């Protein structure tokens, strides 16, 4: 916790607390639990932006349901069932993209939902860096500083410490993971919670959340909330803590490099890879790329004269990720972003992580050979699978 605070609030330790969970999807539960403690017996409105571009479990978690078949203890849990019936959630999903693929403007829909529910507990989940790098207009937060528990999904963590500090200072909670941009092992989630929210929860009853002990351990809640720690299993997740240590090592190394240098490298990489994609008729860039994060490139893939659908992209993804590729320079395996649906269409993604950026900035110079060769492999594999 102290290492994270040093990175994002200058080490003062008085700006936020850290709430843990085994994955980014588990972070969707925390605001619901908090609102149920602050407003017992009331229905919680949960506004969720860009659900199709969040983690695979986030949609079920947003409704207070188990999103997987196994919990962090290795026990079986009933995926799709409510974790508890002690509070009710009214979920309002706001799609990320129009049918055309263009990024949707969700601000007015959010205003309408809030206006229709005066006095009700509301959680507003925005995204800043979805699977395709979409960034919600965070100005909506300033319109409703009171009455909404704002949460920004930064699980990709492709942002600068200054924005993290700014949002926390506005009372906004931040969902983060160490396993996306910072390339730590998967299942590495945390929620950064402004300290005043924890203070509001102090002393609030929590017995109705006992069933959430099937998902969270006592150590996942901060010491300031003994009413939660006392009803959840005393079963510290050592693996989670180790994964965060790895993530923090990488964060410290990356953030020690001047921001203008890393930003320039990311822009250069993006131009080079997009240039390669543009050379082939089999690739189509997603609309509004200029509105997304430069370290994520989203594109459709075509073969046999037609655009591949989700299942075909999944087959392409599995073939590439599970196979070995000795033609790569120094490596023989690849990983890329899993397919994402929008309407009836789908796309895949290439993304640049912090470790990769640091390698590209080494004295040997900028060498995008492997990145360009991955595009070659995608094109070649699509032809083999769907044109032969």
Please provide the spans of the model-predicted regions.
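Active-site phosphate-binding strand-loop segment of PLP-dependent enzymes
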Residues: 84-151, 158, 181
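Conserved N-terminal alpha-helix of the aminotransferase class I/II PLP-enzyme fold
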Residues: 1-26, 30-42, 51, 75-77
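Active-site C-terminal subdomain of aminotransferase-like
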Residues: 179-293
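Low-complexity, serine/threonine/proline-enriched polar segments
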Residues: 56, 63-100, 236, 289-291, ...
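Conserved small-domain helix->loop->beta segment predominantly found in fold-type I
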Residues: 251-347
């Amino acid at each position: 916790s102290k290492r994270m605070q040093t990175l994002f609030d200058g080490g003062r330790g008085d700006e936020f607390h850290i709430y843990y969970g085994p994955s980014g999807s588990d972070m969707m539960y925390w605001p619901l639990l908090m609102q149920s403690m602050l407003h017992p017996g009331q229905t919680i409105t949960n506004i969720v932006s860009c659900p199709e571009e969040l983690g695979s479990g986030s949609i079920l978690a947003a409704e207070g349901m188990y999103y997987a078949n196994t919990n962090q203890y290795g026990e079986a849990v009933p995926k799709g069932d409510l974790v508890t019936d002690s509070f009710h959630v009214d979920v309002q999903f706001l799609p990320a993209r129009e049918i055309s693929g263009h990024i949707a403007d969700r601000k007015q829909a959010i205003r309408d939902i809030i206006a229709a529910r005066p006095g009700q507990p509301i959680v507003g989940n925005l995204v800043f860096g979805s699977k395709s790098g979409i960034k919600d207009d965070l100005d909506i937060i300033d319109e409703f500083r009171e009455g909404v528990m704002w949460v920004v999904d930064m699980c990709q963590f492709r942002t600068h410490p200054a924005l993290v500090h700014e949002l926390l200072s506005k009372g906004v909670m931040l969902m983060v993971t160490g396993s996306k941009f910072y390339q730590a092992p998967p299942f590495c989630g945390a929620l950064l919670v402004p300290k005043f929210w924890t203070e509001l929860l102090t002393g609030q009853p929590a017995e109705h959340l006992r069933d959430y002990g099937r998902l969270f351990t006592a150590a996942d809640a901060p010491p300031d909330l003994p009413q939660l720690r006392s009803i959840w299993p005393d079963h510290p997740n050592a693996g989670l803590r180790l994964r965060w240590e790895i993530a923090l090592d990488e964060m410290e190394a990356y953030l020690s490099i001047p921001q203008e240098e890393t930003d320039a490298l990311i822009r250069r990489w993006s131009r080079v890879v997009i240039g390669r994609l543009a050379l082939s008729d089999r690739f189509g860039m997603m609309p509004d790329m200029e509105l997304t994060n430069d370290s994520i490139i989203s594109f459709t893939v075509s073969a046999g004269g037609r655009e591949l659908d989700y299942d075909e992209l999944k087959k392409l993804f599995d073939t590439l990720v599970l196979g070995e590729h000795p033609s790569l320079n120094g490596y023989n395996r690849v990983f890329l972003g899993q397919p994402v649906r929008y309407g009836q269409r789908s796309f895949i993604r290439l993304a640049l992580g912090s470790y990769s950026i640091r390698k590209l900035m080494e004295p040997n110079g900028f060498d995008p050979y492997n990145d360009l060769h991955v595009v070659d492999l995608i094109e070649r594999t699509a032809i083999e699978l769907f044109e032969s």
